Amino acid sequence: MAKLAVNVDHVATLRQARGAAYPEPAAAALAAEAAGADAIVVHLREDRRHINERDVRVIKEVIRTRLILEMAATPKMLGIALSLKPHTVTLVPEKREEITTEGGLDLINHHSSIKQTVEALKNAGIMVSIFIDPDLDQIKMAHRIDADMIEIHTGAFCDAVNEHQRQREFTRIVDAAKIGTRLKLSVNAGHGICYNTIKAFQGLDEIDEFSIGHSIVARAVLTGMDRAVRDMLALIRAL
C-alpha cells in the first residue's frame, strides 16, 4: 500500500500571512503524524517565504517519522541540508516569482551539477529524491545520476481542464511510474493532488508514496489536521 507524506508548508504560509508566531508547523506535523502520516515534508525555499530553518530543526527534533526536505540544488542549500540531516532530500527547481513549484527539474541540461549534489547528500547518509516531470528521458537521467527515488510531478494531471487532457497526462504518469520501477527507483508522486484526484491512482501499484500538502491543510482549516489526514489515508488505502 502506498504511503502518505504530509507537507506542512502552508501552515507556515498562514503564519506568514500575518507575520505572527502561530500556527506552528511543528504542531501540525505532530498532529499529522499522530493521524497516521508516514512522513512529513517541508520545502525550505531560498526566499524563506513560508518554512524557515528553525521550523525544519524543530520538526526534525519532535517527529518520529521521516523528515523529507525539499530544496533547490544550490551550494548554499546543500550546506544547510548537510547540517540539518533530514532522512530524505527532494531536489526541486525554484523560481522566486512562482506561487508554487511549477515543474520538475531539468536533469538533461543540468545533470552534471545536480549529480554533484546527489553524491554529497548520499555520502552524508541522506536519501535523495528528484522532483521530475513524467518524462522518460528525465527519469532515465535520474537513474544515471544515482538518485534513490523520483517524485513524479502530477500538477499537469491535477490541473487538467478537460477529460482529454486529464487522460493524456495520467498516461504519462503511469508510463513514468512503470519505467521508474523497472529502473529500481522508488517512485513517489506529488503536486496538486487532492481528495478527488487521488482516486485516479487506483491500481497504480508502482507509486510508493504520495506527497500531499495544500489540499490537506485546506481541509484541516475546517475539520482539523487529524480528520484531514485520516480522510486522505482512507482514500489511499482504497486504491
UniProtKB/Swiss-Prot annotation:
Its main location: cytoplasm. The record marks 151 as: Transition state stabilizer. GO terms for cellular component: cytosol. Keywords: Cytoplasm, Pyridoxine biosynthesis, Transferase. InterPro entries: Aldolase_TIM (IPR013785), PyrdxlP_synth_PdxJ (IPR004569), Pyridoxine-5'_phos_synth (IPR036130). Its EC number is 2.6.99.2. The keyword Cytoplasm applies. Pathway: Cofactor biosynthesis; pyridoxine 5'-phosphate biosynthesis; pyridoxine 5'-phosphate from D-erythrose 4-phosphate: step 5/5. GO terms for molecular function: pyridoxine 5'-phosphate synthase activity. 3-amino-2-oxopropyl phosphate binds at residues 7, 18, 192, 213-214. It is an enzyme of class 2 (transferase). 1-deoxy-D-xylulose 5-phosphate binds at residues 9-10, 45, 50, 100. The active site is at 43 (proton acceptor), 70 (proton acceptor), 191 (proton donor). One of its GO terms (biological process) is pyridoxine biosynthetic process. It is found in: Cytoplasm. It catalyses: 3-amino-2-oxopropyl phosphate + 1-deoxy-D-xylulose 5-phosphate = pyridoxine 5'-phosphate + phosphate + 2 H2O + H(+). It comes from the Bacteria. Homooctamer; tetramer of dimers. Belongs to the PNP synthase family. Catalyzes the complicated ring closure reaction between the two acyclic compounds 1-deoxy-D-xylulose-5-phosphate (DXP) and 3-amino-2-oxopropyl phosphate (1-amino-acetone-3-phosphate or AAP) to form pyridoxine 5'-phosphate (PNP) and inorganic phosphate. This is Pyridoxine 5'-phosphate synthase. It comes from Desulforapulum autotrophicum (strain ATCC 43914 / DSM 3382 / VKM B-1955 / HRM2). The lineage of its organism: Bacteria, Pseudomonadati, Thermodesulfobacteriota, Desulfobacteria, Desulfobacterales.
